Amino acid sequence: MKYSISGIIIGLVSLLSSVSAGEWIRINQLGYLPESPKVAVFMSEGKAAVEEYVLVEVFTGEIVKWFDNPKKANTWGRMQSVYRLDFSDFKTEGTYVLRVGETMSPRFVIGNRVYDGTADFILRYMRQQRCGFNPFERDSCHIHDGYIVYHPTRNGKRIDVRGGWHDASDQLQYVTTSANATYQMMFAYLKNPEVYGDVYDAYGLPGANGIPDIVDEIKWGLDWLNRMNPSKGEMYNQIADDRDHKGFKLPSQDHIDYGWGKGTGRPVYYCSGKPQVRGEFSNATTGVASTAGKYASCFALGAEILKDFYPDMADILLVKAREAYWHGANNPGVCQTASVVSPYIYEECNWTDDMELAAVQLYVSTGETSFLQEAVEYGRFEPVTMVSFYQFRALSFGECERFAHK
């Protein structure tokens, strides 16, 4: 039997055209509060005219409400038809799906407790990123860190900087990002302490220890920052560098050789206040204040957070907050991170926001008005620059504004 090419093509086209376009309904997977706006999105790869949609109770299969008010939206990606499905006026608690024709949404809940546990859920990522001991692996890593570099007198000396968090899917560690994460967690706990539970212990393993899990995570970060600032005027900015980027590996299997032997320790970059390596070039470090300010604000707020749980450590942190602040004041400028293989770094371009937040936080912790006055002055120096995730600008402005008018 012989078939013409044109016949085969026509047959394939007919077959493909008979396959219906993909359609989806996207919902808030956490669910919806009864009194809150409730919107889902219908999307289709083909042309679709949606005129109505229904809300179905999952356990009975009953249609509990019909809607005839879909709002057509712009196309999105390969989705040729997009509609917003508003069902805000339905407030009965329960478990439901939305249906458009034969297309069903995933099930979702309407109820007053849909957000319970979401604050703690975020901490799963922080525990996953832990260095020193990783509760997800239930194994230790990087226990030999590290060797000092860029110090005027201590290059190659050992320093104990275990702990903290890995920055991303690599295993580098930076004060730039870790201090930000620590402060953000403290700020969140300070504003809403009641939303955090106690399900894990201090090591991130299952089992309550009488301390909110977010405070356990905060202390994990503060312990590391404390090690990275072991004495007055001695600050370190990062552990390891992009020589780490040699394939995917679990933290416990990181055996990169930085010059001291495989897996025997990683470089710990001293805050020298001077340019350091950036691939074939040098970074644009001009001082220490951007890092010192981060230390100071974290230590000052950390003293407030930990005083009810670890009072001795809280006392130490408040002393170190003052020391870090004055070290930054005496060494103005930005302290950028370093890289060896490529030119990609955290390109810190501002330091006054860090010092402003540090001054405000020290004012809150000590009540000394001189710190508030200095915070206002740092705010006046603030350049108009783009907000980035590792800068404390928004927090420093907000806190300074809050206290300056009291």
Predicted features along the sequence, with ranges:
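Bacterial N-terminal signal peptides
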Residues: 6-17
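Positively charged n-region of N-terminal signal peptides that target proteins for export
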Residues: 1-5
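Exposed aromatic-hydrophobic patches
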Residues: 41, 80-88
